[in-house]
Amino acid sequence: MDLYGVLKPLFRFMTPEQAHHLSIRVLKSGLVPDLSGGPDDPVLATRVWGLDFPNPVGLAAGFDKHCEVADALFRFGFGFVEAGTVTPRPQPGNPLPRLFRLDEDEAVINRFGFNSEGLAPFVFRLGQRRASGKHGIVGANVGKNKESEDALEDYGAGVSATCRLADYLVCNISSPNTPGLRALQARAEMETLLAHVISVRNASMPDPAARTPLLVKVAPDLDDAALADVAEASLATGVDGIIMGNTTLSRPASLQSKFKDETGGLSGKPLLALSTERLGALYRLVGGRLPIIGVGGIASGADAYAKVRAGASLVQIYSALVFHGPGLVTRIKTDLAARLKADGFASIADAVGVDVR
């Protein structure tokens, strides 16, 4: 039995948040075996933003909130890891309980509210990693403090502190658990924010060829008009990419769990159809001019392939790990490679957006 097989029964006797804390402790212990399956199939390699990804399957933000275990997570076979969301100043987030497993639905509801240790320890760990020459692409996902009255200042602080240490940056303006945050997705507000953080990044990194790519993370709940605003704001400001999407406030009628009506954002299997449809719509709007990371409901190679065909240059998973364990990463990669080859694609890039062009 593997380590996950040993721990899984223990997780069921813990609250979801306790199980998460135990997972972090195990990853920090150095006891995690290499589950990567060896070198990735060359068909999975892809180059985006000048970064060479060994495979397109990444870990979404929210697991390694404080940038504690990025290197251990690469032992699962991820092509990249996104740490955060980190806020400028420490904050506890929302009261417990704030994380719920919907086992019958293979879904999760969370209302964490950007619990964060703040930028100082996050940046220290990123800096340690950079100084040690560790390999592996690590992104930094930044947000705003709940009580902050100046979103521009908070996001600017996050970008300024992390841009020279992370491989890519993400401004998270789509969490449903910070009051008023999603209002930043409106066109005027989004253009103002993105113009500001891009200027902060550029001032910190004067050489255009060496600038860390900056992405924006948006919600799957955006209607067509709002999605068009996101596309136009992104193209107008020159942001480098978009993540579609975050958790959803919607509740599909199919949900069975007793936790289905808990307040917070829903992730996992029930989000797959919505997030993939919105991904395709966004890809059409940006016309392939901006790379998109597809997130939401991925639990198989088929799901990942659907995201790629809908317009994702890269994909991320998180909730599915709760139900299927870390071995899922290698299974997704193996199946994705087989599907690409079966359809005659020589690379991930060749398949991006083929269903929506």
UniProtKB/Swiss-Prot annotation:
Disulphide bridges, residue numbers: none
Active site feature: S175
GO biological-process terms attached to the record: 'de novo' pyrimidine nucleobase biosynthetic process; 'de novo' UMP biosynthetic process
Reaction(s) the record says it catalyses: (S)-dihydroorotate + a quinone = orotate + a quinol
Top EC class, one word: oxidoreductase
Keyword check for Oxidoreductase: yes
Positions with a binding annotation for substrate: K65, N110, R111, F112, G113, F114, N172, N177, N246, T247
Binding site for FMN: A61, G62, F63, D64, K65, T85, N141, N172, K217, G245, G268, G297, Y318, S319
Keywords for the protein's UniProt record, in alphabetical order: Cell membrane, Flavoprotein, FMN, Membrane, Oxidoreductase, Pyrimidine biosynthesis
Cell compartment(s), UniProt: Cell membrane
Cofactor: FMN
Primary localization class, coarse: membrane
Molecular function GO labels: dihydroorotate dehydrogenase (quinone) activity
UniProt membrane topology term: Peripheral membrane protein
Protein's pathway: Pyrimidine metabolism; UMP biosynthesis via de novo pathway; orotate from (S)-dihydroorotate (quinone route): step 1/1
InterPro entries: Aldolase_TIM, DHO_dehydrogenase, Dihydroorotate_DH_2, Dihydroorotate_DH_cat, Dihydroorotate_DH_CS
GO cellular component, one term: cytoplasm
Note on how the cofactor is bound: Binds 1 FMN per subunit.
Annotated EC: 1.3.5.2
Assembly and binders: Monomer.
Function: Catalyzes the conversion of dihydroorotate to orotate with quinone as electron acceptor.
Family that this chain belongs to: Belongs to the dihydroorotate dehydrogenase family. Type 2 subfamily.
Protein name, per record: Dihydroorotate dehydrogenase (quinone)
Gene this chain is encoded by: pyrD
